[in-house]
A protein has these predicted regions:
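Short, P/G- and charge-enriched loop/turn segments at secondary-structure junctions
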Residues: 4-7, 66-72, 146-150
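Short aromatic/hydrophobic "clamp" motif used to bind/position activated sugar donors
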Residues: 26
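Short, charged, surface-exposed secondary-structure boundary motifs
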Residues: 2-3, 61-66, 137-138
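Conserved donor-nucleotide/metal-binding helix-loop-beta segment in metal-dependent transferases, i.e.
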Residues: 33-67
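A glycosyltransferase accessory/donor-loop signature
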Residues: 84-194
Length: 194
């Protein structure tokens, strides 16, 4: 029922109910990501009392934009990778807060559930370095406009590559996508039977 960007699926909203999982900590990862190294250091990170740890949205942090709830004045995270303190979510009934936000926010939520999460956790989230959710869409956007200095592609492969926007490696109608070769390396790898 919400208007959002076409590449954001209904399934993205499922993470709003994470507090019902029978664990105290969870690491949520979008399905359009490639993990290139162990996430042990990320998962065992000291969250310093925050209910969620995430990476700032790389595109929105570097552009002028208007968020339907007025969050353009505060750091806004990308919800593709979330380290979540579920015990704290249950204690504060975050699911109810998210659902309440969903009923009161404007029906135009360009970034789907990410808008609700940023509204509820405004100024109450731990900001992680960009390599934990390296968002390829930002690099592609700025490179096309000869502004690669705004958000350069790193020299090393980040631990988490997030193929944000509609430009996905498996969709052949898009041009140069940062770290597309990493996606194809994993796609073409021989995977042992489980």
């Amino acid at each position: 029922q919400y208007r959002r960007l076409s590449h954001i699926s209904d399934a993205a909203f499922f993470r709003l109910m994470m507090q019902h999982l029978p664990v105290d900590r969870a690491l949520y990862l979008d399905s359009d990501m490639v993990i290139t190294q162990s996430l042990h250091d990320l998962f065992s990170l000291d969250m310093r009392g925050y209910p969620v740890a995430a990476v700032q949205d790389s595109f929105l942090a570097r552009t002028e934009w208007n968020h339907p709830t007025g969050l353009h004045t505060t750091p806004y995270f990308n919800s593709g990778m979330l380290l979540v303190d579920l015990a704290q979510w249950r204690e504060h009934n975050i699911a109810a807060q998210l659902l309440q936000t969903a009923t009161t926010i404007d029906k135009s939520v360009p970034y789907g559930d990410q808008c609700f999460l940023n509204t509820v956790f405004q100024k109450n989230w731990l900001q992680l370095e960009e390599s934990w959710n390296f968002q390829t869409g930002a690099v592609e956007y700025f490179q096309k406009r000869n502004l690669s200095e705004v958000f350069p592609k790193p020299d090393t492969v980040p631990p988490v590559i997030h193929y944000t926007t509609r430009a996905k490696p498996w969709l052949c109608d898009y041009g140069e996508i940062p770290f597309i070769e990493v996606y194809w390396q994993y796609y073409c790898a021989d995977w042992p039977e489980a």
